[in-house]
């Protein structure tokens, strides 16, 4: 069924680099940072606003690319950006996160094709989770920064989900343990990071109520 969704088939990303295009400008020599926003991403103003792009580009001299994850923004399948990624059919979540890993690897390949020699990744919330996934497959990343990463969506669902919906799910035999088992196949916690420890970074909020500290400690 997931393959029948048309919008996620086309990749989208926002790009901000010196002089817009052309390696001749010296843009290719600048390090690139892949910035991955969180749940309900997909609007350039909001996505760029989460990462202080002018500071990253002008102060640090970085080129930026902000990919739009499946089921978000121009790739959404319902009225609201992100619907289906973390709610609804569990298999849609699994397929969307698997596609996320695939898409991000294609983003890395595209950036390399622009002549980039140093590529880092920085994600927030769902983007932090996606950063951890990418770090399990790309050994040549200059850095991977997982910010406020959700690491266990099953636990988060049971923490924030509507009680009536959770009760119905459990009556159908879909409890926390079953959901955790299903989502293990797309969990960065069961994958070995491919980049060295000294190039991996993580941070969270001690009082964050959406992504609580135990998610970051995991």
List each model region and its residues.
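Structural beta-sheet core signal
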Residues: 35, 121, 146, 201-202
């Amino acid at each position: 069924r997931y393959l029948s969704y048309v919008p996620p088939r086309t990749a989208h990303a926002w790009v901000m680099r010196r002089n817009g295009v052309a390696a001749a400008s010296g843009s290719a020599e600048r390090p690139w940072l892949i910035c991955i926003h969180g749940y309900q991403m997909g609007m350039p103003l909001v996505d760029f606003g989460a990462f202080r792009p002018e500071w990253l580009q002008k102060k640090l001299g970085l080129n930026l690319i902000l990919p739009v994850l499946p089921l978000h923004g121009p790739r959404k399948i319902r009225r609201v950006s992100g619907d289906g990624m973390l709610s609804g059919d569990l298999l849609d979540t699994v397929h969307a996160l698997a596609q996320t890993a695939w898409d991000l690897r294609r983003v890395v390949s595209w950036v390399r094709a622009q002549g980039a020699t140093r590529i880092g990744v920085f994600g927030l919330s769902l983007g932090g989770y996606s950063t951890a996934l990418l770090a399990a497959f790309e050994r040549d990343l200059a850095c991977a920064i997982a910010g406020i990463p959700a690491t266990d969506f099953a636990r988060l669902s049971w923490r924030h989900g509507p009680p009536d919906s959770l009760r119905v799910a459990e009556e159908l035999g879909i409890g926390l343990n079953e959901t955790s088992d299903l989502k293990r196949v797309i969990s960065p916690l069961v994958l070995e990071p491919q980049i060295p420890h000294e190039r991996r970074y993580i941070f969270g909020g001690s009082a964050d109520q959406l992504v609580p500290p135990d998610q970051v400690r995991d």
